[in-house]
Amino acid sequence: VGPYRVFRRLLITLLATASLAAIPLATTSQAASAGSTTPRLAAYLWAYHHTAGHPYCWGGTGPGCYDCSGVVMAAYAQEGIHFGRSTTDMLDSGRLIRETEGQARRGDLAFYGTGHVEFFVRPGHTFGALETGTLLGWHQWNAWWHPTMFFRVRGAG
């Protein structure tokens, strides 16, 4: 592995880790006491509290490492919602309701084409796993890397 790739991985990891502290989030207990927890929000909060900082690994479903669909699958499974293992399984499951970016809410799914999925956090930001050598965390979109489709999970609020 060349020095540029090592530096790039380190930089991505540092930025992802540092940016996690900048997200104002309610804890699961705070959201529950406020009476606002939907399965969608609970799945996102589970992913954030249990997987942030874990490494990405291709095909990973936890608990030590996850890939993009593995973390989404594991988080929604905590809420009793199952819709397949891969991004294409999720898209073909019949459980997803298409929505616009403006309709997306925290915990909805943001797809980058058909090959990558993350949790929608707020406009311009997602939570998930990017690629081997990075950690699960919060990501800011940019001109060349941004979701192309947004979905609410049927039955998740």
Language model: regions and residue ranges:
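Short acidic-hydrophobic sequence patches enriched in Asp/Glu that either
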Residues: D67, N142-A143
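Extended aliphatic helical segments
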Residues: V1, V6, V71-V72, V117, ...
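Residues that form or immediately flank small-molecule/cofactor binding pockets and catalytic motifs
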Residues: T61, E131, G155
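Generic detector of well-ordered secondary structure
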Residues: A21-A22, M73-A74, F120, G128
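Intrinsically disordered, low-complexity
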Residues: G2-P55, Q78, G102, W144-G157
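...with weaker cross-activation on analogous glycine-rich loops/strands in unrelated enzymes
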Residues: I81-N142
